């Protein structure tokens, strides 16, 4: 188990570095996507992004802005996605759909490098998500 933890930690850092190398620096988005890619069923996660119904737990998750009306207390803008990690109210990042697709491109590329057998499915989901938000 100790070896597995070291490998996951190494992969996590490689993924964080890749995000930063590509100018993507929102720490909570990075943390959540890295956890999704390394600790969860990533294909189900991508399906959740496509359906706008991504995993939510007490300490990790994704919320779409269309779940709130402008008059709601939790409203955080139109066409945005909130990533949270941790229990503090301030432990979150909010990004646009365009930014979401940029972050997903990096994590999908990384995931495919480690799971080549799932490349076709991953790329299909990524393409469907980009088309949904009209991102090239």
For the regions a language model picked out, list residue spans one by one.
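Mixed-charge, Lys/Arg-enriched low-complexity segments
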Residues: 105-136
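Negatively charged, low-complexity tracts enriched in Asp/Glu with abundant Ser/Thr
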Residues: 2-61
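Detector for Asparagine
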Residues: 2-3, 22-25, 90, 102, ...
